[in-house]
């Protein structure tokens, strides 16, 4: 991996899909979403530009899912089922990358994660992206 804090190696659980993600703004874009799909998936995501994911292996092992408007495309390993990334609905020129797939990181490394209002998505309401809360991780003593 390149010695750049914004470039992160990643993979799915079984290792069939391996990639390198160049984060758009480091971890400043970290978030959770309240849309019906993300609520069930429970992932923490961070942004990468559309050309910011380079597959090292297994791109052909990815499968995808779309719902509702069909504008966001969610990618998964067809072997282990892990969500690796998605094309964002709010910005089609960006990917959301699953933080849990990034080497050496865990969603629990982030003590506070902004939660964005996906139930009232800006593309539906015409309004700005709205933060509806904060997901907090409090370490046990």
Where are these regions (language model features)?
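A short Gly-Trp-Pro
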Residues: 1-11, 16-141
